[in-house]
Each structure stands twice: as C-alpha cells, then as structure tokens.
Amino acid sequence: MVTAYSSTPDQTDHTPFITANGTTVRDGIVAANFLPFGTKLRLPKLFGEKIFTVEDRMHPRFSNTLDIWFETRAQAKQFGVKITEAEIL
C-alpha cells in the first residue's frame, strides 16, 4: 500500500521538515518502516522511472506501507491511497 503525507504538524512530529534520518524533506522522499534508510525504489505503475529514497519512518502500526512526501497537504490528499508494486533497486 502506498499513502502520502506532507509537512503539517498533524502528520509529523515537532520537526515537520526533518526526516527520521535527519535529512530535509524534498521531492522523492518516502517513509517506510520495513526498509533501511537509504533504500532506493521505484513505483513504476504510478511514477514510471522516478527513483524514491527511504529517509523517513511512519507510526509503528504501518508496517508494510510506503508513505510518499508531497509539498502540500492538498497534493497528498489528492494522491490518496494506492495499491501497487514497488521495485527495490
């Protein structure tokens, strides 16, 4: 399952623009609890050849989910929830 988030206080901790890995959020960042930081992946059915990097974590209850960072809450809501395959690089 793939979901989306943005840097709003209700979706993050007290440092909404810093990832769990200590980097600044940017396009191409994903949160995942089941992959190590730095893992590169693609979501070809949704984003073609675009490469994402795991730099963030989610609440522990989301064990097999990828959460894509979007710049705005509206973009994250528009993306919604998708079921797709991830290609680990």
Can you say where each PLM-predicted feature lies in the sequence?
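Solvent-exposed, well-ordered loop and adjacent helix/strand elements within mature globular domains
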Residues: 1-89
